[in-house]
Curated annotation (Swiss-Prot):
Part of the 50S ribosomal subunit. Keywords: Ribonucleoprotein, Ribosomal protein. GO terms for biological process: translation. One of its GO terms (molecular function) is structural constituent of ribosome. InterPro entries: Ribo_uL30_ferredoxin-like_sf (IPR036919), Ribosomal_uL30_bac-type (IPR005996), Ribosomal_uL30_CS (IPR018038), Ribosomal_uL30_ferredoxin-like (IPR016082). One of its GO terms (cellular component) is cytosolic large ribosomal subunit. This is Large ribosomal subunit protein uL30. The gene is rpmD. The keyword DNA repair does not apply. NCBIfam families: rpmD_bact. It holds the Pfam family Ribosomal_L30. Belongs to the universal ribosomal protein uL30 family. It comes from Yersinia pestis. It comes from the Bacteria.
Amino acid sequence: MAKTIKVTQTKSSIGRLPKHKATLIGLGLRRIGHTVEREDTPAVRGMVNLVSYMVKVEE
């Protein structure tokens, strides 16, 4: 089984760069407090790093 991480949106995407909004959608996050579980891959880690100021990550 692949290792997973939990990603939770902690801040609003209103007024953010369009690229950052698209990254949140790509991660599957829709609203503040929404949590998704994703595979721990370099691609997902890169997306999380881009919007790290808006999300919380749990290993």
